[in-house]
Amino acid sequence: MDKTKIIDGKMVSELIKAKITEQILKIKAKKQRVPALTIIQIGNNKASTTYIKNKKIACEKVGVTCKVLNYPDIITESALIKIINDLNNNSKIDAILVQLPLPSHINSEKVINTIITKKDVDGFTPKILGNLMLGHYNLLPSTPKGIIALLKHYQIQLAGQHVVIIGRSNIVGKPLANLLINASATVTVCHSQTKNLSDFTNQADILISAVGKAKFVTAEMIKENVIVIDVGINRDEDNNLCGDIDFHNVFSKVKMITPVPGGVGPMTIAALLENILYFYQLNQKI
């Protein structure tokens, strides 16, 4: 395997986390309160529990205080909103994260929108997403932010490039499309209703897949020397962790590619930590 083709998100994320650790050590040296994140989990979804565990470990490694509040999935929407409002009003909490998905009886959008903008570490509230669309932003949703940071680290040109995104979620596809447009890329967003998907993916200079289907993108769907960013985290038929891209099948054709694991995932966590530190500095008016 030609390792020069690998876009190493784990390595880049460690560089980012080292800088954050350095800044938090300076905060500790001044005997000041360190950045604090509160994560809310409803129920015991296994995937959510794993994601939260990874976030908590990452926080502790860089010196961020991370508290997880777990409530049963019978909690009412009004009770959850009250909990969030209490956190909104707590000056010692810099960032709030509600782990999705939520139970069906709870309106996820209403709950997320309860988080005040200056504590919305995921960047999902309307004000943050609206500013992103206008090109005015200090904070970005974690996964799109991590992807852009990864592309910048590897000096991958965006201006004038045709970027095809598979997936139009509010969490990845839509905000990422806006970021790429702001970087002067030509962007095509494909989704479940796109006809003849391969016609679009075969035109991509950069292909980004966030569709959530194991090994969905095959070699026949891409052109030679494409750069591939795999956002998917899935399990294949043997229960092995894999992305949306059929990695081994496409590897000989690509110019560069992110692996799963070790690509976008670590960058999402690193971007989340950057967002927590940003909100802390805002809260402390540093």
UniProtKB/Swiss-Prot annotation:
Residue intervals passing through the bilayer: none
Entry-linked SUPFAM superfamilies: Aminoacid dehydrogenase-like, N-terminal domain (SSF53223), NAD(P)-binding Rossmann-fold domains (SSF51735)
Pathway: One-carbon metabolism; tetrahydrofolate interconversion
PROSITE patterns in alphabetical order: THF_DHG_CYH_2
Family: Belongs to the tetrahydrofolate dehydrogenase/cyclohydrolase family.
HAMAP family: THF_DHG_CYH
PANTHER family: C-1-TETRAHYDROFOLATE SYNTHASE, CYTOPLASMIC, C-1-TETRAHYDROFOLATE SYNTHASE, CYTOPLASMIC-RELATED
Protein name (database record): Bifunctional protein FolD
Provenance organism: Spiroplasma citri
Lineage of producing organism: Bacteria, Bacillati, Mycoplasmatota, Mollicutes, Entomoplasmatales
Gene name, Swiss-Prot/TrEMBL: folD
